[in-house]
């Protein structure tokens, strides 16, 4: 799979009128020639740098079950999702690794000795998993996540939606699963299809053998999204202005958004969003980072998977 780096913009100077010719002796002329050669070499180096920045790098990925070796990588990606929110990402990472019959991590295939010295063969480029919030109710991280989404729902939505979300999260007869799919920003979305296909197989197997996460009636997804700065996407205060287009960091999550029965956004503008593995650029238009919370019925997953196959099949 190939990821493409954005080419660096080079600022051009304003042309100046030529100076009058100046007489030089032979030594001065040699020095000028040497300086010109140095300038040529420097220009060549800059051109080579630009070529490197603009080149495509092909990396093959492979999926593995979650293990203790993946702790740091998974936790880092979870921190990228929750930012400064009061969520115990260490405990959440532990819970995901403990239930390693569910979920996968993606790593580079066969890191050779000749590759970049900074490349760690165990580096986690992304992961997918699911945590049954109903089964894990009472653990600190689960309580914190539920409080987080309810708090922002109260700030951004009508009272009826807050009550609806609270009811869904506390109905023990219809478990809600927290769907987590995080990856470096420059990992292409095509990787999502096999990851979700494998997750669906694992969830079906867990349901068949009565293991944790086996049955969820709803999926809760917190997605990294962006809107053009200054645009209002809140549903609490209706406006005649057209809502800004919502852009998804993980492109495939738009299909989940379309099937969600409950959804809202909240801003994370004040928090440090470093965008692991890359930087966002939308034609140099200032963007406001958001988190989009969605609740998707479990019986809609087959339709979503069909969409993923249609758009992400290589």
From Swiss-Prot:
Residue positions where Phosphoserine is found in the record: 42, 112, 281
Interaction with CDKN1A: region residues: 161-259
GO biological processes: DNA repair; establishment of mitotic spindle orientation; microtubule anchoring; microtubule cytoskeleton organization; mitotic spindle assembly; mitotic spindle organization; neuroendocrine cell differentiation; regulation of cyclin-dependent protein serine/threonine kinase activity
Keywords carried by this UniProt record: Cell cycle, Cytoplasm, Cytoskeleton, DNA damage, DNA repair, Nucleus, Phosphoprotein
Principal location listed in the UniProt entry: nucleus
Coiled coil: none
Cytoplasm is among the record's keywords: yes
A Pfam family per the record: BCCIP
Ranges for region Disordered: 1-56
InterPro entries tied to this protein: BCP1_family
RNA-binding is among the record's keywords: no
Gene Ontology cellular-component terms listed: centriole; centrosome; cytosol; mitotic spindle pole; nuclear cyclin-dependent protein kinase holoenzyme complex; nucleoplasm; nucleus
Cell location: Nucleus; Cytoplasm, Cytoskeleton, Microtubule organizing center, Centrosome, Centriole; Cytoplasm, Cytoskeleton, Spindle pole
Chain intervals with Acidic residues compositional bias: 25-56
Stretch list, region Interaction with BRCA2: 59-167
Tissue: Expressed at high levels in testis and skeletal muscle and at lower levels in brain, heart, kidney, liver, lung, ovary, pancreas, placenta, and spleen.
GO MF term (any one): kinase regulator activity
Protein role: During interphase, required for microtubule organizing and anchoring activities. During mitosis, required for the organization and stabilization of the spindle pole. Isoform 2/alpha is particularly important for the regulation of microtubule anchoring, microtubule stability, spindle architecture and spindle orientation, compared to isoform 1/beta. May promote cell cycle arrest by enhancing the inhibition of CDK2 activity by CDKN1A. May be required for repair of DNA damage by homologous recombination in conjunction with BRCA2. May not be involved in non-homologous end joining (NHEJ).
Subunit structure: Interacts with BRCA2, CDKN1A and MTDH/LYRIC. Isoform 2/alpha, but not isoform 1/beta, interacts with DCTN1/p150-glued and ACTR1A/ARP1. Both isoform 1 and isoform 2 interact with alpha-, beta- and gamma-tubulins. Interacts with TENT5C; the interaction has no effect on TENT5C poly(A) polymerase function.
UniProt miscellaneous comment: HT1080 cells that constitutively express low levels of BCCIP display increased levels of spontaneous single-stranded DNA and double-strand breaks.
Family statement drawn from the similarity comment of this UniProt entry: Belongs to the BCP1 family.
Protein name per the record: BRCA2 and CDKN1A-interacting protein
């Amino acid at each position: 799979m190939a990821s493409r780096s954005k080419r660096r913009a080079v600022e051009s100077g304003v042309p100046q009128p030529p100076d009058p010719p100046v007489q030089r002796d032979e030594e001065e002329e040699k020095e000028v020639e040497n300086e010109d050669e140095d300038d040529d070499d420097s220009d060549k180096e800059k051109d080579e740098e630009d070529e490197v920045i603009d080149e495509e790098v092909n990396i093959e990925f492979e999926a593995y079950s979650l293990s203790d070796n993946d702790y740091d990588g998974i936790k880092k990606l979870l921190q990228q999702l929750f930012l400064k929110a009061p969520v115990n990402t260490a405990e959440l990472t532990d819970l995901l690794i403990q239930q390693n019959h569910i979920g996968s991590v993606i790593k580079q295939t066969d890191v050779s000795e000749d590759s970049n010295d900074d490349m760690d063969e165990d580096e986690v480029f992304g992961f997918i998993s699911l945590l049954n919030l109903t089964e894990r109710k009472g653990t600190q991280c689960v309580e914190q996540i539920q409080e987080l989404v309810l708090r922002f729902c109260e700030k951004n939505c009508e009272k009826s939606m807050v009550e609806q979300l609270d009811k869904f999260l506390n109905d023990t007869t219809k478990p809600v699963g927290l769907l987590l799919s995080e990856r470096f920003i420059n990992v292409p979305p095509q990787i999502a299809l096999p990851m979700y296909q494998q997750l669906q197989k694992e969830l079906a197997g867990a349901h068949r053998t009565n293991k944790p996460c086996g049955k969820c009636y709803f999926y809760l997804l917190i997605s990294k999204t962006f809107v053009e700065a200054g645009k209002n996407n809140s549903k609490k205060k209706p406006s005649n202005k057209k809502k800004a287009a919502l852009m998804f960091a993980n492109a495939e999550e738009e299909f989940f958004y379309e099937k969600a029965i409950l959804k809202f956004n909240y801003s994370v503008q004040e928090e440090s969003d470093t965008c692991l593995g890359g930087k966002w650029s939308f034609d140099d238009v200032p963007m406001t980072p958001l988190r989009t919370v969605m609740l998707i019925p479990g019986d809609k997953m087959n339709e979503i998977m069909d969409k993923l196959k249609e758009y992400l099949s290589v």
